[in-house]
Amino acid sequence: MRREDKSTLKNGHIDTMIKPKGRRIGLIRLSAIGDVCHAVATVQALQRHAPEDDITWIIGRTEAALIADLPGITFVIFDKKQGLKGFREVLKAIPAPFDVLLHMQVSFRANLLAAVVPAKIKWGFPKNLSKELHGLAINRRVPMPETPHVLEGFQHFAYALGVPAFTPKWSIPIPQ
């Protein structure tokens, strides 16, 4: 039986997740260009809070083309057109298990991927926002409002890692 963390928010943070910096953080947000752009604000808040953390973003091919020039992030491309080979390619590109995986998507394909990506802690959405077997791919649920805007929901993933409340900021380099 899966044991879920019962942590609660204290001062805007998950009290059990405030850890030393220098973590290997994985993130899954494969698709939906608008949602990927919202996730950028959360990733950049994580970078400002803990620049020593190593962030790897597992992302779709089209979405990666939009944000591939973001500094300080390793991108692993998931090509859904490759089927099972796409899953194997992602796993080959991850050199070691993540300390933390932020599973920021509830599609069936993303849930399958999160289930096989190695990580000690896998944060996902609360039950009311989960679907397509999301709960089977995670071992902790991020507390958040009942019906958050996508951007607000993503911010709560950063709070779970000890980032204090922040105003979203985007800095997306545009190639010449």
Stretches with model-predicted labels:
Residues 1-176:
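Catalytic machinery of carbohydrate-active enzymes
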